[in-house]
Amino acid sequence: AVIVHFSSYRTMYIASRKHKENIAEYLLYMWQIEDIIRAYNLDIDHIEESVIRPMGLDEERAHALREWYVSLIDMMRCEGVERSGHLQINRNTLGQLVDLHRRLLSSDKYAEYSAQLYKTLPFIVELRAKGGKAPVGELETCFNALYGVLMLRLHGREISKGTADAVAQISKLLAMLAGYYKLDRDDKLEF
């Protein structure tokens, strides 16, 4: 299952590791980094004081992490996502996952993935009905749901049994997709 425990600790290094190991967790993690940057009003000095310094990193790592945040802040400003939305690098990652999702669904070799999607579809339909926003694709709906629940949990809020069931099923689908993504990236997935 896709389970993410968020922390500001060693964010750049965690992001790099997640990108290699679990692309679904990476995407959720990067969405949280975007929100952390917004919470500090895209102010690198405030981020350095409140996020980077408390980590107690050596000077070289602290500098690298600061530069990483600076580059993300610059991208957010250039792309106009200072208040909401996602960086193009994160939208590209989602796009890659959507492309793989479609390829898996169109192949007879990955019936178990299709079966997992069909188990998840009722939750996706329900989430879309509750969403009230412009309709988004199946995977983005899943990621939005997981991210929303993660934020609720971070703030100590309870979630209903129905929501917990939805998140469990969505997590299974995204974990399977993340596994296929890793295989595809390593040229070990055949269509």
Residue ranges: model-predicted function:
Residues 1-11:
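Short, Lys/Arg-enriched N-terminal segments with co-localized hydrophobic residues
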Residues 13-84:
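N-terminal interaction modules that seed assembly of large macromolecular complexes
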Residues 14, 56, 64, 73-77, ...:
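A structural motif
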Residues 36-39, 57, 71-82, 99-107, ...:
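Amphipathic alpha-helical interaction surfaces
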Residues 49-50, 88-91, 164:
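Short, charged, amphipathic alpha-helical segments
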Residues 51, 69-72, 94-97, 121, ...:
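Short amphipathic alpha-helical coiled-coil/interface segments
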Residues 87-147:
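A charged, amphipathic interaction segment
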Residues 125-191:
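Glycine-rich, aromatic-bearing surface loops/beta-hairpins
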